[in-house]
Every structure is written in C-alpha cells, then in structure tokens.
Swiss-Prot record:
One of its GO terms (biological process) is DNA catabolic process. GO terms for cellular component: cytosol; exodeoxyribonuclease VII complex. This is Exodeoxyribonuclease 7 small subunit. It comes from Leptospira interrogans serogroup Icterohaemorrhagiae serovar Lai (strain 56601). One of its GO terms (molecular function) is exodeoxyribonuclease VII activity. Belongs to the XseB family. Heterooligomer composed of large and small subunits. Bidirectionally degrades single-stranded DNA into large acid-insoluble oligonucleotides, which are then degraded further into small acid-soluble oligonucleotides.
Length: 95
C-alpha cells in the first residue's frame, strides 16, 4: 500500500506504520525489505506528524480566537467597556 502524502488519512498512515513496526519487530523481512519498510515508516511518520502539526495549529488558532471573544464580552454578551461605563455612571449618580 503506497499512498502519497496528499491521499492518505492520518488513521490509515498510522495503521500502516503500526503494521510495519510489528513486522520489523518480528523480523519478518529480509535486510533489503527491512530497509524499504523502515524508509516507508519514516515517510508515514512525517505524514502523521504533518497532520498532527496542522491540527495543533488549527486548535491554537481557534483557542486564541475564542479567548479574544471571551475577553471582549461579559456574562450576558455585553462588552466589558460598556458595563464599566454604565457602572461608573451609576456610581456618579449616587454621589
């Protein structure tokens, strides 16, 4: 099963990598086959790492975006600056 980076899913790459690792551990390959399997395993590792890095970047971006939204809005979705202005106006009315 030789698939290129753009065509293989994370799950498929990981499954193939696990199969290669198991065969290498059992020494089911000749030396030449072992080298080819190791090379394929390294390709699959890079594919998996790239997919994980992309997912991590997306999560970080979403988290940053969400934290900005959380910091800009109050409990009821009102901006904190509006709430502060209203509170200040109410305090001034008391004095």
């Amino acid at each position: 099963m030789v698939e290129t980076k753009s065509k293989i899913s994370f799950e498929d790459a990981l499954m193939e990598l696990e199969q290669i690792a198991e065969k290498l551990e059992r020494q089911d390959f000749s030396l030449e086959e072992s080298l080819k399997a190791y090379e394929r395993g390294m390709e699959l590792k890079k594919i998996c790492q790239g997919i994980l890095d992309t997912a991590e970047g997306k999560i970080e971006a979403l988290t940053k975006d969400e934290s900005k939204k959380t910091n800009k809005t109050g409990f009821r979705g009102e901006s904190k600056t509006t709430e502060t202005k209203n509170n200040t106006a109410q305090e001034e009315d008391l004095f």
